[in-house]
Design a protein with these regions (language model features):
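N-terminal (or domain-start) structured segment
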Residues: 22-114, 162, 175-198, 203, ...
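C-terminal lobe and pocket-closing loops
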Residues: 207-277, 307-310
């Protein structure tokens, strides 16, 4: 009888262990991740996201594959709407910057509170760019030409933040540059090189290759001081040209659907903290493109994001008036 009881207890323990193992949830993530880029190929968000994916995979920071998907349009809103429509919010993340914050707010795709913050990564510079053989080799050339023929020169913009920059140039210089909205920096570059527009708004990573190749030329930087990023070391700032009010920095980070689980949020916050500590990020991206590295974890980024969004909306209201 004792032997029978002992045997039955052993069987019960074994069966319980099997069911316990089978019922335990596997650690997140258990399937592939889609990294959505709410912009066209070749733009600043595209360059950053693909580098992030490369760093994550090379350093084995995520056990699953990560696939990049470009969904440009609507100043980021098209990609954000695509993310919102996904049935499993834990497996889709997307890049965000100040311009796409404005686009998402205006379209209602990421209104206040309707997102999950993962990490802030850095702060980017903004450039005023033209074709390398353009007759407008300096900002003074451009201003003189537009004042002589108001409305005759166009500036390509990828988003509302770019349009704010153009509006502020017009206010500062008393000019009438015309802004034209495109889906991304890649499209703006094509339009400049094709002679369809004369200028464009770019982040350094978007223009670096074409400036280095001699196709484009940056003639002004929206900053207090010059950048050390190649090939923009000699680009003058609006501040040194007598317009310290023309200073813009673009924050860059990563968000997810508002319904993402806390487990997934913390996983990605940790992943991006590790990414930001790598040489590939610090040197291969930030130093190369003049980006100021600035990591904030998911909770700190949420507090920052809400306040930054309010400031951006105030600037956009100024543009609308």
């Amino acid at each position: 009888m004792k032997k029978t009881l002992v045997f039955m207890l052993m069987v019960l323990v074994a069966v319980t262990a099997v069911f316990a193992q089978g019922g335990a949830e596997a650690a997140y993530p258990t399937q592939g991740i889609e990294f959505v880029i709410p912009a066209s190929a070749g733009g600043g968000s595209d360059i950053m996201a693909r580098l992030l994916i490369d760093i994550i995979q090379k350093n084995n920071l995520c056990p699953q594959t990560i696939t990049a998907t470009n969904k440009g349009g609507g100043s980021g809103a098209t990609g954000q709407a695509y993310v919102n429509a996904k049935s499993n919010p834990d497996y889709t993340i997307f890049t965000i910057n100040d311009a796409h914050t404005l686009g998402g707010n205006a379209a209602g795709t990421i209104p206040e509170g309707n997102f999950t913050t993962l990490a802030m990564l850095g702060v980017d510079e903004v450039l005023f760019v033209t074709k390398a053989d353009s007759p407008y080799q300096t900002m003074d050339d451009a201003v003189a030409a537009i004042k002589a023929n108001p409305g005759s020169l166009s500036v390509g913009c990828a988003d509302q933040l770019d349009r704010i920059c153009v509006a502020d140039i017009n206010e500062a210089y008393g000019t009438k540059f015309t802004d034209i909205l495109f889906n991304g920096a890649g499209d703006i570059a094509t339009a400049i090189l094709g002679g369809h527009i004369q200028f464009g708004m770019f982040n350094p990573n978007e223009a670096a290759a074409l400036v280095a190749s001699g196709d484009l030329k940056a003639i002004a930087l929206f900053s207090e001081q010059r950048t050390s990023a190649h090939p923009f070391e000699d680009v003058p700032t609006f501040t040194e040209m007598g317009h310290p009010e023309l200073v813009y920095k673009m924050t860059r980070g990563v968000l997810a659907n508002a319904k993402m689980s806390r487990e997934a949020q913390l996983f990605w916050s940790d992943v991006f903290e590790k990414v930001c500590a790598t040489d590939e990020w610090q040197v291969g991206y930030c130093q190369k493109y003049g980006v100021t590295p600035m990591y904030l974890n998911c909770d700190d980024y949420e507090a920052f994001y809400v306040e930054n969004e309010k400031s951006l909306i105030e600037k956009l209201a100024k543009l609308s008036n």
